[in-house]
Amino acid sequence: MSTTPTITLADLERIREPYKVLSKTARPENPSGQCTYREYLFSDAVKYPIYKRATMTNEEIVTFFGKITSDKHTHMTESDMWTFVQCALSLKDPVDRSSIFDKGFWDANHLCADYATAQPANTGKVAMSHHNPGVVVTQLVPKYDTGGSSSQETESMASKAEAISFYFAWLTRFSVKQAPNTINVLYDRVRATYLKFYSTSSSIFDTFRPSNTWLQGLKDAFDTFPRVKNTLILHVAHAETYFRPTPKIFNVLRFLFFQNLEFMGLHAYVSIVTIMSKVALPPSQVLSWLRVSGSEMAIDEAFMIMNTLDNGMIDNGHNAERLWKYARCLDQGYFNRLQSSYSAELIAMLAYIEINMGISTEVGYNSPLNIYAIANNKAVKEVGRMKADVFIQCKNSVVSLTQDASVIDKVYAAAQQKHIRSEEAARPSEQNKEDEVVAMDTDAPSRKRRSDALTTEKPKKALPAIIKLPNIPDF
């Protein structure tokens, strides 16, 4: 009868003699295709090249709108892109209709050296496919007559310009996102949202409904002209802190900019923060548990962000800068140790933790399992699922041991332990109380509930056996 050989720690750590010349701390250089890690410093990030914006008149905004929506407009120059962004940054205050971004910006001495003098060029061009006028659009929101939305002929120049700025600001989300196939539904929603914020509507939202191809061209233009994109990002980042005390303006900006441009490619960090908000555990405990093999650098990066940058964690964070949240739109080297493609197992584990906690769903468009880094990798998702199960077990156990834990939490944690060991041989009783809970939970094996006896569902795959944590109460 064969026996499993005993493997000691020394066996596992043994290194071949010729290989001992290699450094234990150095690592091979990353492939050139991977962006180089860049340490975030506000003083450096705020100096990325940008243009100085100017206030546009209503006539200039409407004229430019007519230009880029024309059949003849087949290419986007840097000058065109800059005008597009200036239209977006001409967004109006929903209360007094003043220009939001005229109210404040960082002092010029913090910005790039040529901030006041740099001008966009007309040389480079990006192809733009004209929106498809033949698409039949299903209207989810009814059109309004002169009591709401005016026709192109009767609507005032100011009303058109206000709607165009809102529309262009909304379209900036496609600088970092791919347009979905359901884009026409989103066009109806943006018109409805404009009505909620500004208590009026506009014919502009029916005049121009660009195709996915046009939106891809817009994304390409943002990527081709980084100085234009940088200008947008710096203004948005400044506005998040500046307008927090002004809810009506902040909510408009959150819908148009913040929720789309922040934390680009940092699904892991967003997931960690979301999980922390749902569990009664200190952030340090959660990070310690999540620092599993292969995720050390990613979790250490998350710790660095929380310890030095995250506005909810640092002293006086409410008034501190928030450019760090948008820094990856300037340079993808920022925080790239947390980038989804570099930490797939961590992403999978976090996804299943969210699913187990009811934060996210396992199926559907918004499921975290659709994240590109793990979507088609069954092996990584299986490892993530098992580690997520362990995280949930640890969370339940710790919660059940706290002094003011609910009796429900205690019984639930004990029941989860029994479920994990259900495929193993019965363990000898350690305490008399265990027999009492077994009797209370099962009421003897022969007295199954009718629904259990009649079920035709196939048995689920057993969860991996887990060593019982010390001091977990048995009932």
UniProtKB/Swiss-Prot annotation:
Recall the taxonomic lineage recorded for the source organism: Viruses, Riboviria, Orthornavirae, Negarnaviricota, Haploviricotina
Q: What is this protein called?
A: Nucleoprotein
Location in the cell: Virion
The lineage's top-level taxon is: Viruses
Give an example GO molecular function: RNA binding
Q: Does the keyword Ribonucleoprotein apply?
A: yes
Query: What is one cellular component GO term in this UniProt entry?
Result: ribonucleoprotein complex
Which family is this sequence assigned to? Belongs to the nucleorhabdovirus nucleocapsid protein family.
Entry keyword Thylakoid: no
Please state the gene responsible for encoding this protein: N
Keywords from UniProt, A to Z, are: Capsid protein, Helical capsid protein, Ribonucleoprotein, RNA-binding, Viral nucleoprotein, Virion
